[in-house]
Amino acid sequence: HSLGEQVSDLRSFAFTNHLVEVSDTFESLPVEQAVDKVMQAVGGSGTDYGQTLLDIEAQLLEDIDRRTTVLILGDARNNRGQAQAQVMQLLYQRARRVIWLNPEPVSFWGLGDSEMKRYAPYCHIARECNSLAHLESTLDALLRTHSASA
């Protein structure tokens, strides 16, 4: 969560089937305690990306503009729920960048309950990211891009 040290106005969210803001949790607690608290808040049910996207539309869309980078970390597995890809399209139209980092290999995108092939067209960047080293290098590249354009 040290990304917040590099980027102003960083807000963090978690979800399984509803969006929960966790920005203050990570700012006020040690990482292990913050993760435990977030897991309690979001519960352990199956993920519902469609409902989460509807939550983003209802709660955050007004705050998203051409200065906003939306960064999503997740596998896009929706447990057969409605994809709500039209919300991804709205994010794509409003935000400076929409970036999706997916832990699954690209060859899995669109298989089974994966909605990644529906979401990817509305991402400026969509890529496989399945290790801490990969995440660090991806975020470093994003921060360099952010610093260069700030």
Predicted regions, residues:
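Acidic, Ser/Thr-rich peripheral helices and adjacent loops at domain boundaries
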Residues: 24-43, 118-126, 130
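Von Willebrand factor
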Residues: 1-29, 33-68, 70, 105, 110-111
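Active-site proximal loops enriched in glycine and acidic residues that flank catalytic Cys/His/Asp
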Residues: 14-17, 72-74, 102-105, 130-131
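Charged helix-capping and loop-helix junction motifs
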Residues: 83-89
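DG-centered beta-turn motif at the end of beta-strands
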Residues: 1, 68-79, 124
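Von Willebrand factor type A / integrin I
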Residues: 89-150
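Short acidic, S/G/P-rich loop/turn micro-motifs used as interaction or catalytic elements
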Residues: 19, 77-80, 106-107
